[in-house]
Amino acid sequence: MREKDLIKLEFDKVKEVLASYAHSPATKEKIQNLKPYTNKEKVKEEIELSKAFFDIAENVRLFEFEDIRELLKKAKLQGAILGVEDILKILNVINLTKEIRRVLSSHVQRLEPLRKVYKKLYTFSPLENLIIGSIDPRGFVKDEASEELLRVRKSIRAVEEEIKKRLDNLINRPDSAKFLSDRIVTIRNGRYVIPVKTSHVKKIFGIVHGTSSSGYTTYVEPQFVIHLNNKLTELKQKEEEEVRKVLQRITEYIGDYAKELLESFEACVEVDFQQCKYRFSKLVEGSFPDFGEWVELYEARHPVLVLVKEDVVPVGILLKEKKGLILTGPNTGGKTVALKTLGLSVLMFQSAIPVPASPNSKLPLFEKVFTDIGDEQSIEQNLSTFSAHVKNMAEFLPKSDENTLVLIDELGAGTDPIEGSALGIGILEYLKKKKAWVFVTTHHTPIKLYSTNSDYYTPASVLFDRETLKPLYKIAYNTVGESMAFYIAQKYGIPSEVIEIAKRHVGEFGEQYIKAMEKLSDYVKKYEEEFRKLEELRKELQKEKEEVEKLRKEYEEAKRKGWKEAYKEAREYLRKLVQESEEIFKKAKEKKEIKEFVSKKREEIENLAPQKPQKLEVGDLVEFMGKKGKVLEVKGNKALVLVDHLRMWLDTRELQKVGKAEPQKETKVTVQTPVMEKRDTLNLIGKDVETAVRELEKFIEEAYSAGYKVVKVIHGIGSGKLKSAVREALSKNEKVKFFRDAYPKEGGSGVTVVYLEYGEET
């Protein structure tokens, strides 16, 4: 398909909205490169995948992830070393892969299309453990990453302590105030120095490492710590070398897993893409049409208009029995919008993007879509405008065939009306010969009359309210619309004398034509109103049908849960039975105790055994799994029982008759469901470090016990002391999987998002 046709139909704007929901630059790139498929099976496959994902979309929790494709290429190179930030980007994708795999694992059996994505979601436990064991969430390579690194860092700390100790002895001498500008130890050029008054710099033997901007202070490395600073420098270099070795080892692992990581990353992008489509569908209330022999687009709304307006009037666009549609009617009546709605809906459908139209809609597959649409409707159209339209049509007319959709706005405009009409009819005849699908709009009467006698084109018109001079944005089929030039002119104050003169120039035939159009338009409006009422009735029936289906599913689920609970109780009883047996046999001193115990338990077990079918009647009160119910119907060994507002067919051997039900007065009961309070956020602003850390540990313990997987800690920005204390405490907490700065929409750097090791995400 031509790029300019996609742009004319505003397909790029739909993709912009889709991309705004993406969690990764790679997903945005995928959306930007998206084009309609021209293979029917491919469209079906993509739609089935989207439908399957939409079924579980609310369970999927995605987070931001980077494009790691170039990093994986680099990791495969001999001797390559990835930086800490790059490795953490890959770890982030591993974590996302694990989360998506967890959600999909319980649905792939039920939703077959998800299996293709699920198979690409690998597990990376060895690599994940290596990264987590070597690098902390802040991007710091841990001491434990290697034995040599641990030894070197211990040496570094020992040397640093010795240097500080010696310098502290100097700056804390009583006479030091005479030559020091401040009693502190600082670092310049990677070496420990002290700030000396420039005027007294000669009193300290050592190396000068610079002066302050004011010149008042000179930073001096005393001679007695030079050898220690040298040793520290050597150790720092060894530390860097060890860190490089750690990163290189991790990079080699990543290179070994590059193929699987790439496939998992692509699966993450696919899931992100599907979630973008799901959120877009919710925004526009979209659905997927089915494939059909004809164009049947019901209650369609222009997708771009839906995004910027709330009160978009739906329209039905039908090409049934005939492959062509000629739409007429006044300006601002919605002709161009209807034309674009069909075109854009086709592009979206063949891209597997939900269309804002009724799910009952159907569309054929189009291999090509050609457009001739002017973005600006001008009162004065010149030859250059006409030439541009002709040039465009000359390009696509020869390429049109039976699988082509041609959309032409204002056919025949831009030149002499008589010649323009004749040329327009010629184009329509040519496209008919090509068996193309055609949707055109026009004002020209000869083309209107042509459509009424055509076996290929259906005439249609947009409806207009004469009283308010407002379009109704509805299409009436098998009728032609008047341009209403005289009526609109009169309403807006053109003198009646002018209107009468104009009508005389139209001629007797033209006047009869106008009156016929007015009468036909009134009839169509009445027809549309009746059709609207029927459509509302159909919707109500559909809604009731969906409600019945929902209740049926709820009943089946409740019944399934009931059996599951019964099975759970039985297992628990048997577990306790075994436990009691072990305790009795252990403690029993006499054979009598054992006999009594065995006799008692045998009696209990016999009570659990299946009973003979009971003779039950309608109205009997029975007991089932400790709950009372009422018999509504009996068929052989089966009884329909009402238990806790649920109707269930049960085996009569599972029921215990407890009496006859007494007639009860109808009682209305209002049930209020308590709202469970969720505590997934901790605010530490204003707390001192000690109190904050104590509350944080308690909060993490409670959140972990409550089953949360993600929680938030608000610490603010401030001096950064509280945030550092929070991060340090989190890094030591075994229940914390990892943590990160909140995204701007979550609170930014003043909030830390914490992922717990177990539990379920809120």
Swiss-Prot record:
Xref: CDD domains: ABC_MutS2
Q: Which Gene3D superfamilies match?
A: 3.30.1370.110, P-loop containing nucleotide triphosphate hydrolases
Keywords for the protein's UniProt record, in alphabetical order: ATP-binding, DNA-binding, Endonuclease, Hydrolase, Nuclease, Nucleotide-binding, RNA-binding, rRNA-binding
Annotated EC: 3.1.-.-, 3.6.4.-
Recorded hits in SMART domains, A to Z, give: MUTSac, MUTSd, SMR
**Tell me, what is one Gene Ontology molecular-function annotation carried by this entry?**
endonuclease activity
Give GO BP annotations, semicolon-separated. Answer: mismatch repair; negative regulation of DNA recombination; rescue of stalled ribosome
According to its UniProt record, this protein's enzyme class is hydrolase
Q: What does this protein do?
A: Endonuclease that is involved in the suppression of homologous recombination and thus may have a key role in the control of bacterial genetic diversity.
Assembly mode = Homodimer. Binds to stalled ribosomes, contacting rRNA.
Family in the record: Belongs to the DNA mismatch repair MutS family. MutS2 subfamily.
Report the protein name in the record: Endonuclease MutS2
